[in-house]
C-alpha cells in the first residue's frame, strides 16, 4: 500500500475525517487569537469578577462558606501550583476592592459584565450566530452567570468535598481523599463547562453534545494543569531568569492555555452536530444551500397543513447539516419574512403557493445587479436569466413536480 493510499484510507475513515473537520474549524475560528484576547480581558476583569461574586454572596450570610469554596475552586483551576503567588496578589487586590466607593463598585460590575459579554460574543461567533438576544435577556443571562452560577457551584463543591472526605475516612482509606477530591473537581468543572456550552450561545445546543464537549474539555484542562504543575516543579531554569516574578509569565501562559482549551471545547461541541449522517464531509459548502432552503420550507409547509410548529431538532432529522448552519438559514429566512419563531418552534408565515422560487434563488444564490452593470455583469445576467425564468414557479408547484419524481 502506497503512502497516498494510506492517506486516502485515513480520509475515508469517519473518525479521522471528523477530527480533521474539527481541526479546520479550530483554525477557521482563529481560536489562538481569540484565546489571546480572552487572556488579556480575563487579566483585567478577574479581580472585579471575583469581587462581585463574593460581594453578592456576602449579602446572604449563609452563602459565605460556599463563596469561599468557589474562590478556592477558582484558585485550583485557574492558577496551577507554582503560580500560587499570583492568586495571593489577586486576593489582596480583591480585599482592597471592597473599600471602593459607589462609583468604583459600579465600574467593577460593568467590568465583570464586559468579560461575560466577551465570552458570549466569542461563543456566538463559534456557533455562527448572527442575531443577538434582546438587551434585557442578555443582562439577565449575564447577571445569572455572575451570581447564581458561582453560588450554585460553591454549594455543590462544599457538599461534594464534604461527602468525599467522609467517604474516605469511613472507608479507612484517607489516602484516596486526594483522588476523590480531584474527581469531584473534575465533575463540577464538567458541569460548569456544560452550562457554558449549553446556554451561552444563542443557538440550540443538544444537552448530550454539550456534555460530551464539556467532559472532553474538563479532562484536557485537568491533564494540562497536572503537566503544567509537573513542569514547574521539575524544571526551574525559568526562575533564574525571572526571579521573584517567575509566577507572572507562567500565569499568563496558563490563562492562554486555559482559554485555548475552553474555546477548543466549544469548537468541538459545535462540530458534534455534523457527526450524524457524516454532514462534516460537506462542511460549510454553500452549493447545496438552495436545496436545503427548499427542504426547510417544504417541511414547514407540511407542518402548517397539520397545524404544527417545528422545533430545530425536527429539521435535523430530515436535513443533513449542522445546527449552526441550519440556524443561519432559519434566521435569514426569518429576516426576509418567510418564517418566524414561536414558542413551539418555527412556523411558515404564508402558504407555499405564495413563495416564488426565483425570489429564493435571488436571495440565496444569485441576484442581478440593478445598476452599474459592466460587460461581465451583463454576460453573467445573460447566462442566469434563463435559469431564473425556469424557476418562475411557486413552492407548491415545485413540490408537486418533485413528488412526481419519487
From Swiss-Prot:
Localisation: Cell inner membrane
Membrane topology value: Multi-pass membrane protein
Membrane-crossing segments per the record: 43-63, 100-120, 139-159, 176-196, 210-230, 248-268
Any one annotated GO CC term: plasma membrane
UniProt entry keywords in alphabetical sequence: Cell inner membrane, Cell membrane, Membrane, Transmembrane, Transmembrane helix
Claim: Cell membrane is one of the keywords in the record: yes
Pfam families associated with the record: Virul_fac_BrkB (PF03631)
Source species, domain of life: Bacteria
PANTHER family from the UniProt entry: INNER MEMBRANE PROTEIN YHJD, UPF0761 MEMBRANE PROTEIN YIHY
Family (UniProt): Belongs to the UPF0761 family.
Protein name in UniProt: UPF0761 membrane protein NMB0524
Organism: Neisseria meningitidis serogroup B (strain ATCC BAA-335 / MC58)
Amino acid at each position: 500500500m502506497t503512502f497516498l493510499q494510506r492517506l486516502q484510507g485515513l480520509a475515508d475513515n469517519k473518525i479521522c475525517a471528523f477530527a480533521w473537520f474539527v481541526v479546520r474549524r479550530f483554525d477557521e475560528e482563529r481560536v489562538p487569537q481569540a484565546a489571546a484576547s480572552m487572556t488579556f480581558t480575563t487579566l483585567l476583569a478577574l479581580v472585579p469578577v471575583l469581587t462581585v461574586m463574593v460581594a453578592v454572596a456576602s449579602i446572604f450570610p449563609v452563602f459565605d462558606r460556599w463563596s469561599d469554596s468557589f474562590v478556592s475552586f477558582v484558585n485550583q483551576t485557574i492558577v496551577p501550583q507554582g503560580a500560587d503567588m499570583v492568586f495571593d496578589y489577586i486576593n489582596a487586590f480583591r480585599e482592597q476592592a471592597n473599600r471602593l466607593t459607589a462609583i468604583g463598585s459600579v465600574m467593577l460590575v460593568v467590568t465583570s459584565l464586559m468579560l461575560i459579554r466577551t465570552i458570549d460574543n466569542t461563543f456566538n461567533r463559534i456557533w455562527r450566530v448572527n442575531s443577538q438576544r434582546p438587551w434585557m435577556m442578555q443582562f439577565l443571562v449575564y447577571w445569572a452567570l455572575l451570581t447564581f452560577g458561582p453560588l450554585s457551584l460553591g454549594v455543590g463543591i462544599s457538599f461534594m468535598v464534604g461527602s468525599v472526605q467522609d467517604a474516605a475516612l469511613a472507608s479507612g482509606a484517607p489516602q484516596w481523599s486526594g483522588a476523590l477530591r480531584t474527581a469531584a473537581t473534575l465533575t463540577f468543572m464538567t458541569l460548569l463547562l456544560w452550562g457554558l456550552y449549553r446556554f451561552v450561545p444563542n443557538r440550540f445546543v443538544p444537552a448530550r453534545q454539550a456534555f460530551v464537549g464539556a467532559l472532553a474539555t474538563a479532562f484536557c484542562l485537568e491533564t494540562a494543569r497536572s503537566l503544567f504543575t509537573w513542569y514547574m516543579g521539575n524544571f526551574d531554569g525559568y526562575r533564574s531568569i525571572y526571579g521573584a516574578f517567575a509566577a507572572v509569565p507562567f500565569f499568563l501562559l496558563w490563562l492562554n492555555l486555559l482559554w485555548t482549551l475552553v474555546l477548543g471545547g466549544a469548537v468541538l461541541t459545535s462540530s458534534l452536530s455534523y457527526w450524524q449522517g457524516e454532514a462534516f464531509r460537506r462542511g460549510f459548502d454553500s452549493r447545496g444551500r438552495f436545496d436545503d432552503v427548499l427542504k426547510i420550507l417544504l417541511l414547514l409547509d407540511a407542518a402548517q397543513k397539520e397545524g404544527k410548529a417545528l422545533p430545530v431538532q425536527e429539521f435535523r432529522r430530515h436535513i443533513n447539516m449542522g445546527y449552526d448552519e441550519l440556524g443561519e438559514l432559519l434566521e435569514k429566512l426569518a429576516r426576509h419574512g418567510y418564517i418566524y419563531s414561536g414558542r413551539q418552534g418555527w412556523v411558515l408565515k404564508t402558504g407555499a403557493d405564495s413563495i416564488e422560487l426565483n425570489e429564493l434563488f435571488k436571495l440565496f444564490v444569485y441576484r442581478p445587479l440593478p445598476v452599474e452593470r459592466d460587460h461581465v455583469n451583463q454576460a453573467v445576467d445573460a447566462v442566469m436569466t434563463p435559469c431564473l425564468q425556469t424557476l418562475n414557479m411557486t413552492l407548491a408547484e415545485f413540490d408537486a413536480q418533485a413528488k412526481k419524481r419519487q
